[in-house]
Amino acid sequence: MWKEKGNAIGNWLLAITAIFGFITLIWIPQASAECQTRSIYCYECDSWTDARCKDPFNYTALPRDQPPLMTCNGCCVKMVRHQRSREVVRRMCTSQLQINLFMVDHVCMMESSGNGHMCFCEEDMCNSSKDLYSHGHQLHLIITIAVAVSWLMGQLLNR
């Protein structure tokens, strides 16, 4: 009896997880494509000259006490560089960069020296975040964990 219930629960969890996984795989690339086709707002600042640009970003500050926003036809960018004992943060739009890369949303690239990184995102004011992971990627991680747990439960209940 327990084995039959275990199989039913494991199969049910696996089916639900597969459905969410499929939806997520369709949803995330569509969100990434939006970065290239619509205008978004990005913070534009440099912590070297504007203390409001530093991490952690003050989300509770009034708009006038936050760094300026700019309209962006691309992705928002956050660059972090460690110079001597100081962390320098720069927030901007990809249209200001002189690079020709295929832009992939919610990706961070480490500097070859290991002294900094550059992250890209495609939601309004997303470059204010300390880590530029979107809810979609958090959802994808949760789904991956759920698949692993449901498989493990199925294995344990089938013994």
UniProtKB/Swiss-Prot annotation:
Lipid attachment residues per UniProt (GPI-anchor amidated asparagine): 127
Q: Does the keyword Signal apply?
A: yes
Query: Which positions, given as ranges, span the membrane?
Result: 137-157
User: Which GO annotations describe the biological process of this protein?
Assistant: regulation of circadian sleep/wake cycle, sleep; regulation of synaptic transmission, cholinergic; rhythmic process; sleep
Indicate the secretion signal residues: 1-33
Specify the propeptide location in this chain: 128-159
Organs and tissues of expression: Expressed in mushroom body (at protein level); overlaps with expression of Sh/shaker and nicotinic acetylcholine receptor (nAChR) components also involved in sleep regulation. Expressed in the adult brain and head. Enriched in the mushroom body, anterior optic tubercle, superior protocerebrum, antennal nerve and visual projection neuron fibers projecting into the lobula plate of the optic lobe.
The listed locations are: Cell membrane; Membrane raft
Q: Kindly list every residue the record annotates as glycosylated.
A: 58
Query: Chief location of this protein?
Result: membrane
Q: Whom does it interact with, and what assembly results?
A: Interacts (via loop 2 of the three-fingered Ly-6 domain) with Sh/shaker; this interaction may stabilize both components of the complex and may be required for targeting or retention of Sh/shaker to neural cell projections. Interacts (via loop 2 of the three-fingered Ly-6 domain) with nAChRalpha3 and potentially other nicotinic acetylcholine receptors; this interaction is required for antagonism of nicotinic acetylcholine receptors.
Name of this protein: UPAR/Ly6 domain-containing protein qvr
